[in-house]
Amino acid sequence: MTAILERRESTSLWGRFCNWITSTENRLYIGWFGVLMIPTLLTATSVFIIAFIAAPPVDIDGIREPVSGSLLYGNNIISGAIIPTSAAIGLHFYPIWEAASVDEWLYNGGPYELIVLHFLLGVACYMGREWELSFRLGMRPWIAVAYSAPVAAATAVFLIYPIGQGSFSDGMPLGISGTFNFMIVFQAEHNILMHPFHMLGVAGVFGGSLFSAMHGSLVTSSLIRETTENESANEGYRFGQEEETYNIVAAHGYFGRLIFQYASFNNSRSLHFFLAAWPVVGIWFTALGISTMAFNLNGFNFNQSVVDSQGRVINTWADIINRANLGMEVMHERNAHNFPLDLASVEAPSTNG
């Protein structure tokens, strides 16, 4: 008689938890990065919603002039924002327990720091989770690399720029009009439109939109016909089919004749690498530009570059931009300082007879 003994697998609770976290069979993959991503993004989202609706005014400039940002304090969806942490706090870590009371924490803009730091940690973990899922499925890692562009951009405006300027009050407000205000002030103080890295970012975003539209329309227009001419070509396609849907040779021929031969890709991998790399590299450069301007390495200054034989300035477009910058600079934080830095840095004339 033969006795077969089956050894029972005794999986601990921790082991089952690990298997569940790293399982690719779940409807939504969690992963170890997800263990940190889920609570941080939930915290950032929850506090953002509550603060956007009900946060009291914040003393953003540290001069006892609170600015209202929430819906219950008179704003709408367009004008509302999470007001950045007060200049009185600077770059100090300012959790709730560091304040004397919750009222003080709210008055000094504590929710902004809480939201931003949790959000940045969350999106960084989302990027790591993309890599983790790719790794478990045996895929290449480029999805996470592409996502690093918006992560870098968010890190630049929410963390690097405040560090360079010395205060979280200089970070980008979390709202529509607050974003526009940040952009206008950034142009006034750093002349970002004249920074080559910003120009590369504009080329990346607009070029990426153009290439995406061109690619999508070209593929949709060169479907492989599986039907008669009496019914739609779309009827010949079934979602998830293994066969190729469109004819890249036909698309290449069309585009090559529309512009010229070498403007068209005949290799699908090269084409899709280009479509991914163009906007990603552009946004990388923009994030790098914000990070350098954070430490006041600003855009090009061509003010008063052209003069006539008598030394009189002939205004160029750079001088028009400079005048606009000065106008924007004197208008923002109008109660925090009497003159923009450009004017205040000039030595005052002596008044002692």
Swiss-Prot record:
Binding sites annotated in the UniProt record for a quinone: 215, 264-265
Compartment(s) of residence: Plastid, Chloroplast thylakoid membrane
Positions of the propeptide segment: 345-353
Keyword match Transmembrane helix: yes
Residues at which Fe cation binds: 215, 272
Parts of the chain that traverse the membrane: 29-46, 118-133, 142-156, 197-218, 274-288
Modified residues (N-acetylthreonine): 2
Site location (Stabilizes free radical intermediate): 190
Chain positions with Phosphothreonine modification: 2
Coiled-coil boundaries: none
Keywords from the named record: Acetylation, Calcium, Chlorophyll, Chloroplast, Chromophore, Electron transport, Herbicide resistance, Iron, Magnesium, Manganese, Membrane, Metal-binding, Oxidoreductase, Phosphoprotein, Photosynthesis, Photosystem II, Plastid, Thylakoid, Transmembrane, Transmembrane helix, Transport
Pfam families per the UniProt record, alphabetical: Photo_RC
Binding site for chlorophyll a PD1: 198
Residues engaged in binding [CaMn4O5] cluster: 170, 189, 332-333, 342, 344
Entry GO CC: chloroplast thylakoid membrane; photosystem II
Single GO BP term: response to herbicide
Modification after translation (UniProt): Tyr-161 forms a radical intermediate that is referred to as redox-active TyrZ, YZ or Y-Z.
One example GO MF annotation: electron transporter, transferring electrons within the cyclic electron transport pathway of photosynthesis activity
UniProt site (Cleavage): 344-345
EC code(s) of this entry: 1.10.3.9
Residues bound to chlorophyll a ChlzD1: 118
Protein family: Belongs to the reaction center PufL/M/PsbA/D family.
Role, per record: Photosystem II (PSII) is a light-driven water:plastoquinone oxidoreductase that uses light energy to abstract electrons from H(2)O, generating O(2) and a proton gradient subsequently used for ATP formation. It consists of a core antenna complex that captures photons, and an electron transfer chain that converts photonic excitation into a charge separation. The D1/D2 (PsbA/PsbD) reaction center heterodimer binds P680, the primary electron donor of PSII as well as several subsequent electron acceptors.
PANTHER family documented for this protein: PHOTOSYSTEM II D2 PROTEIN (PTHR33149:SF12), PHOTOSYSTEM II PROTEIN D1 (PTHR33149)
Assembly notes: PSII is composed of 1 copy each of membrane proteins PsbA, PsbB, PsbC, PsbD, PsbE, PsbF, PsbH, PsbI, PsbJ, PsbK, PsbL, PsbM, PsbT, PsbX, PsbY, PsbZ, Psb30/Ycf12, at least 3 peripheral proteins of the oxygen-evolving complex and a large number of cofactors. It forms dimeric complexes.
Name of the protein in question: Photosystem II protein D1
UniProt lineage: Eukaryota, Viridiplantae, Streptophyta, Embryophyta, Tracheophyta
